[in-house]
Amino acid sequence: MAADAGPGRKMRIKKSTRHAKITGDFGEMAVLYWLSKYGFECALVDHTGIDIIARNPHTNEIMGISVKSRSRTEEQEDEYVSIPNDNFDKAEKACAAFGCIPYFAIVVDAGETIRGFILPMAKVLTLFPKGKAGSGWKMTEPYLARYAADPAIQVFAFQTTTMRWWGQEVVAADAHASRD
């Protein structure tokens, strides 16, 4: 993944050895934050199959959410998110134990955009039925447009900019001054 380093320049991003774990934690917290920001009572849970339990203030349903997070390099930005078949079974069992409806949240950091999608597990399986090993959440532009148009899929996104990073000016400061 390369960050914008100004006109015609790219800053190479080198991920840490624990980046996958950190990405997973970040995805869980981003979803938790977004839910809380919009009035959902919610909590992180350490349980096989789900990561978050939330009460939806719009429907009053209790959601058991399994969060899948990925950080993509520049070459992988359109790559699908693989969801192994056993993840669906584990989410279903956990939700049965807690009396909640199974949901999935998919968080992908790709390029300058971090995208999040929250939807019922049943909708994931309708869009992308289980294959031999699992399901694949597609991340190409046509699919992103379909998700944004689908009222059953909640979508949020962060646009990211690294302005300066350890002595390397990435984006000129005056490029952001006009936003104020």
What name fits each language-model region?
Residues 1-48, 55-180:
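Mixed-charge (Asp/Glu-Lys/Arg
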